[in-house]
Amino acid sequence: EALTLANVSQLLWSAQGVTHPDGWRTAPSAGAAFPLELYLVAGNVNGLAQGLYRYRADQHKLIQLGNKDLRADLAGAAPGQEWMKGSAIIIVIAAVYDPATRKYGQRGIRYAQMEVGHAAQNVYLQAASLNLGTALVGAFDDKRVKEVLKLPSGEQPLGLMPVGGR
């Protein structure tokens, strides 16, 4: 079942949308470091071409990075999670630890990981309000996900959130 572009927009905003002129976001961030990066793997969205996108929270905008449907590739990088191929989209939550570790040392890694939980919970709540289903998948091969998405060396994938109709 296809998602609407409005639904996708709302899901991404719920995870990392800017809520204040100072750049604060929908999910709390230790020291306002905002280490998270969101990617969208679009497979079945009305009004949006299949492909890989980066979410620019500061502009509430998608930047297309590629036009290949990567849902099957991500499912292949997540053993036992083949069902992900059938989702309309997959939201990928990655972290750039540097902003958090610069301020908090190694503890910044923990703070970034906690922030993933906040962002994911917001997606869960927004999905439920839109009568959509999702799950936070952490069982994946980090290296393979980085390769599939061509993530920059400083970014670490921390969660995959397939979303579809219930």
PLM regions: where:
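A glycine-rich helix N-cap at a beta->alpha junction
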Residues: K150-R166
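Solvent-exposed coil/turn segments that connect beta secondary-structure elements
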Residues: Q16, G43-V45, A57-D58, A94-D98, ...
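Short, charged, solvent-exposed linker or helix-capping segments at domain edges/interfaces
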Residues: Q50, R102-K103
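Short, mixed-charge aromatic SLiMs
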Residues: H60-K61, R144-G154
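Conserved hydrophobic/aromatic beta-strand scaffold that supports enzyme active sites
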Residues: R54, I90-V92, L160
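Short, surface-exposed helix-loop/turn micro-motifs enriched in polar/charged residues
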Residues: A30, T134-V137, S153
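N-terminal amphipathic, basic helical "cap/leader" segment at the start of enzyme domains
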Residues: E1-S87
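Small-aliphatic-rich amphipathic alpha-helix that forms the alpha element of a beta-alpha
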Residues: L11, L38, I89-I93, Y97-P99, ...
